[in-house]
Amino acid sequence: MDQPVLYNQPAFPNFSYSPGLGQEGGNYQYLGNYNAPSYPQPFFHVPPAIKSEYGAQDEVTGGSCHAAPFDWHLYPHFQFSNQVGALSSGDPSPEGRNEEDHGSISEERSSGTPSPNSPMVPSYAQYWHHAPWQGNPTGQALGLPSRAHPDGGEKPQQSDCSPTASLESGASNTEDEEVSSALSSRAERGLCSPSPNNASFGSGNEEDGTTLEEMEEFAKELKQKRVALGYTQGDIGHALGILYGKMFSQTTICRFESLQLTFKNMCKLKPLLEQWLGEAENNDNLQEMIHKAQLEEQNRKRKMRTCFDSVLKGRLEGHFMCNQKPGARELAEIAKELGLEKDVVRVWFCNRRQKEKSKSRMSKAHEFVGGASPVPSPAEHISQDYGLAPLHPNRPPFYPPPFPRNDLFPHMVPGMSMGVLTG
């Protein structure tokens, strides 16, 4: 026996329903084509107003449904191919849909514009209801922006999966065109960004008639002649101090040779280096002078530390007790009285005041530790039971009261003690 088509099943043999009742197709638990004992079919009442749209009253039966039949599935799913057209036209045959697909594709290829039922325009159909979005309701082709083709014609731009995506792609293409046009204009002008190392220099930077190329040549020549004469970068700095009274460090000379100084500073340093270069080539004793200056700097003795005997120290302590911060005139009188230099007396008073501040800080810290602290430390409570020495010996120990056994459960029945329970 052939299985009947959906919505054309005969009624149960022992059950018949009136024409005013129709099958509810939205119930997913009803499996009409299942070859097993059928489940009870739910029904809902069809009012006459709705029933008159589909036919007369006597025509409303279990198989009188004008909706397009679909392949049955237990749960709804998406069908991306021409669901809008199928729902709107109501063609029940899949062959007709295939013919429409081929016809729409051929028309799209001939006209060059996508149709509203194209697979590129998605539609999300819902079973037993009309589609929420049926594409272009007017049936006209969507006006998509066209892009100039290299052959001379216009090539239509294909739409993306959604209108929002198409707008975003158009915006990104516009930005790319702007960036490419800016780059092409910069390339036409011949502009180029300078390197990070030479960011402070430029091809047109000139100061005192010196260009960057001339500065590079001079730095290269300076390094070659310095190595040939046997001088170090530190020797050049000392020589500039001996000859011109302005000493430079080895780091400054190194940065000049490697062009890491600013162009303005290099222009200021170049005349001194040119004079030193001429002096080094003509004066043979220059290197000896440099070594002598370096030895004098190394052998320069530090000032001897002043030592005070007990008598002198006692007299200074007496003046300090009278006035801890004397003025310039008082310091001069004390230095004259003790036969010392004024700076020595001044430094001694400064050191003595600092020593007094340190003593006051230590005494305050000791009083805070030895006195009553606002918050008791946990070591005091531990020492009560475990025999540890208390942190503050001057404070009397604290002994907690015994455990209140009888007052533990005051809500219990009177006469019931916390001792041994008697049965």
UniProtKB/Swiss-Prot annotation:
Residues 85-211 are annotated as: Disordered. Residues 111-120, 156-173, 194-203 have a biased composition (Polar residues). Interacts with the transcription factors tcf7l1/tcf3 and vegt. One of its GO terms (cellular component) is transcription regulator complex. Keywords: Developmental protein, Differentiation, DNA-binding, Homeobox, Nucleus, RNA-binding, Transcription, Transcription regulation. Residues 207-281 form the POU-specific domain. The gene is pou5f1.3. Belongs to the POU transcription factor family. Class-5 subfamily. It comes from Xenopus tropicalis (Western clawed frog). This is POU domain, class 5, transcription factor 1.3. Residues 301-360 bind DNA.
